[in-house]
Amino acid sequence: MLEVLLVLLGYVLGSVPTGILVGRAYGVDVRKVGSGNIGTANVMRAAGKGAAALTMLGDMLKGVAPVLLARALGAGPWVLAAVALAAVVGHCWPVFLRFRGGKGVATGAGTSIALAPPVGLGMFALWWVVALASRYTSLAAMVVTVVSPFAFLLSGQPLPYVLYTVVGGAAVLWRHRENARALLRGTERKFGGRSGGGG
């Protein structure tokens, strides 16, 4: 029963619309600006770097908190992986927004850092490298999503964690399908200041 409650908590925390809450604090509805997405890149577009930083931090904590709580309560790798997946699913398909949410990148980063800190931090650093080099946050997200399962596998992480990166990564890639098409067409927004893009 505790395991089920932990997974549900992961989903509920993942569903908290950080971007919308931060946007409101800055006097803007991020759903009506840019791509309309509630994630970090579009919050930057709508309200600037400070709001974007708060959104990224909040979205990452949505992934970190339930995993660390589950671990503190003695949950094993399978439950921890399920909690992590629930948080990402909650962010992508939140109950509070009629299942129309973000793309799971920051929340996924938070869960990865909580599950395996060295690997998760490495993937977070890779995201920044690709994002800054290309100016495409969506490309960075997709690169990290593809690389993560191999990083978790080769670093000897438990099988449930590896499977989580595959299934959770599939959700993130699905949420980025329009970005992938835009990249191929050469119409994807670049990020930077209030005119940036990627999600």
From Swiss-Prot:
Catalysis: reaction(s): an acyl phosphate + sn-glycerol 3-phosphate = a 1-acyl-sn-glycero-3-phosphate + phosphate
Any one of the GO CC terms: plasma membrane
Subcellular location: Cell membrane
GO MF terms, alphabetically ordered: acyl-phosphate glycerol-3-phosphate acyltransferase activity
Top-rank lineage group of the source organism: Bacteria
Single GO BP term: phospholipid biosynthetic process
Function: Catalyzes the transfer of an acyl group from acyl-phosphate (acyl-PO(4)) to glycerol-3-phosphate (G3P) to form lysophosphatidic acid (LPA). This enzyme utilizes acyl-phosphate as fatty acyl donor, but not acyl-CoA or acyl-ACP.
Protein name stated in the entry: Glycerol-3-phosphate acyltransferase
UniProt organism field: Rubrobacter xylanophilus (strain DSM 9941 / JCM 11954 / NBRC 16129 / PRD-1)
